[in-house]
């Protein structure tokens, strides 16, 4: 079983992911979605957490061997990033969504050296907007952002476009395609449900029609 498949299995088992193609969720953007993901739940399950953190470390070593600092996005990327940095014996910082409105007004907490090679950790990629904002903030502080590594992606076309335009490499430990395949195999969804989930990936607006 691949890492992507193992993580998809765990996310379903611990109910970090819910699939309801016949009774969709409403995202903050207003989009009706057959999937809801809360990867923060993974922190409460040591087996799942260990699988994810080791997957992060292996992926970073394989794709970004020159990394010098790990950054986590606030708030979901912070615990994962801190554990990864500890496992890799690397410095850790975290990046706020916007600068503090008091004190020194920091957006990045921790010390980033000019030219320091950084990998940013995120838990979930939908369109990628928030983590790309974090990458831009890190670049302004002088970091050399090598890429973003995340637990899971919805594989939305908008995300691919955004990362391409930003010139930032994205790698995820698991993904939507893998998850719905595992969900069907393990009886979480019906054939009709799988069909709807595949349609959502192709067209997030008209998939129910």
UniProtKB/Swiss-Prot annotation:
Its cofactor is Mg(2+). PROSITE patterns: PUR_PYR_PR_TRANSFER. GO terms for molecular function: magnesium ion binding; orotate phosphoribosyltransferase activity. NCBIfam families: pyrE. CDD domains: PRTases_typeI (cd06223). It comes from Streptococcus pyogenes serotype M12 (strain MGAS2096). GO terms for biological process: 'de novo' UMP biosynthetic process; pyrimidine nucleobase biosynthetic process. Pathway: Pyrimidine metabolism; UMP biosynthesis via de novo pathway; UMP from orotate: step 1/2. InterPro entries: OPRT (IPR023031), Or_phspho_trans_dom (IPR004467), PRibTrfase_dom (IPR000836), PRTase-like (IPR029057). The gene is pyrE. The keyword Transferase applies. Gene3D superfamilies: 3.40.50.2020. This is Orotate phosphoribosyltransferase. It catalyses: orotidine 5'-phosphate + diphosphate = orotate + 5-phospho-alpha-D-ribose 1-diphosphate. Its EC number is 2.4.2.10. Disulfide bonds: none annotated. The keyword Oxidoreductase does not apply. Orotate binds at residue 126. Belongs to the purine/pyrimidine phosphoribosyltransferase family. PyrE subfamily.
